[in-house]
């Protein structure tokens, strides 16, 4: 059997607005705990809807209750597990970390400033010491033997060596612009010379005269300077050796040149304006006074014949 949807016909009748009647029942306890909430029950009666049909509608009553818990933090008084931050500012951790980083940077800056200051001071002291040593080099007083000690003796030796070096440099600078001692162009007799012979002994004597003249001039210039007086026997010995080498030059004439007679030598010197042979040379006398003769070399065939004949022993 099939049921069909039956749609009844409803006719609406105009009427006035219904009146709403509400009844509220509330019960209140004398003592309520903190976590209890007043529950209210409300019941409402809805108006009934009447129609010309056979259907009716009725209202329902509903009741609801909500429980809300109140949260209160525990007290920090006497509790060792809770940090009492009431008397501390906000962001204490960030302040501490920033203070540590700032202290590290400040210490690095102080170390850099101190190291620069010390290095600059050390450099200035060294440069001042070197400048003062170069400025007052040689201007020192020689202490007596009673007041001297090994340290002072070593200092005096170093100062004397420095003075000698400075004097040698000064002397070399004085003679840098001077003419070379063995330059034949400076010979005043070159224009009047008829031969090509050059006398080195004459040039040596000229150099000796110019050297003595320059030396006397230097002594007159620096005679008032006490820093140039170096009282050492090494200086005197070197000066004597230098003078001996200039006074006794080696013979520069060729050994193959034949000896001439005295009369011919005098005419030769007058003609060529040369002093060769007039100055006694120690090396020449030593060579002429030696009685030994060089061994005569033999041909290989003659030496072999002497060996075969028994006149020569190997």
Swiss-Prot record:
A single GO cellular-component term on record: fungal-type vacuole
Listed Basic and acidic residues bias regions: 254-269
Keyword line: Membrane, Phosphoprotein, Transmembrane, Transmembrane helix, Vacuole
Intrachain disulfide bonds: none
Protein's cellular compartments: Vacuole membrane
Domain of life: Eukaryota
Disordered: region residues: 32-61, 240-309
Principal subcellular localization: membrane
Membrane topology term: Single-pass membrane protein
InterPro entries, alphabetized: PRM
Annotated transmembrane regions: 93-113
Presence of keyword Transmembrane helix: yes
Residues bearing PTM Phosphoserine: 148, 254, 274
Annotated family: Belongs to the PRM5 family.
The protein's name in its UniProt record: Vacuolar membrane protein SCY_4732
Annotated organism of origin: Saccharomyces cerevisiae (strain YJM789)
């Amino acid at each position: 059997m099939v049921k069909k949807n039956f749609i009844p016909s409803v006719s609406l009748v105009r009427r006035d607005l219904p009146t709403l009647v509400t009844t509220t029942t509330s019960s209140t306890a004398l003592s309520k705990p903190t976590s209890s909430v007043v529950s209210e029950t409300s019941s409402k009666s809805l108006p009934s809807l009447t129609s010309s049909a056979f259907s009716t509608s009725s209202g329902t009553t509903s009741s609801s209750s909500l429980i809300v818990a109140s949260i209160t933090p525990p007290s920090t008084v006497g509790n060792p597990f809770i940090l009492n931050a009431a008397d501390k500012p906000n962001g204490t951790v960030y302040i501490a970390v920033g203070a540590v980083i700032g202290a590290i940077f400040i210490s690095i800056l102080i170390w850099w400033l101190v190291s620069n200051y010390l290095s600059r001071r050390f450099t200035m002291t060294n440069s001042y010491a070197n400048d003062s040593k170069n400025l007052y080099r040689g201007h020192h007083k020689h202490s007596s033997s009673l007041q001297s000690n090994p340290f002072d003796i070593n200092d005096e030796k170093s100062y004397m060596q420095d003075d000698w070096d400075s004097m040698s440099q000064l002397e070399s600078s004085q003679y840098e612009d001077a003419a070379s001692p063995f330059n034949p162009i400076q010979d005043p007799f070159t224009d009047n010379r008829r031969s090509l012979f050059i006398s080195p002994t004459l040039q040596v004597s000229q150099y000796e005269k110019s050297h003595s003249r320059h030396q006397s001039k230097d002594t007159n210039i620096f005679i008032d300077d006490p820093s140039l007086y170096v009282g050492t026997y090494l200086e005197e010995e070197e000066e004597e050796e230098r003078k001996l080498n200039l006074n006794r030059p080696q013979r520069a004439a060729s050994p193959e040149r034949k000896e001439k007679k005295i009369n011919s030598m005098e005419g030769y010197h007058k003609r060529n304006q040369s002093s060769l042979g007039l100055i006694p040379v120690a090396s020449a006398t030593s060579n002429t006074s030696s009685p030994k003769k060089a061994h005569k070399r033999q041909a290989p065939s003659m030496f072999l014949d002497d060996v075969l004949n028994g006149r020569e022993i190997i």
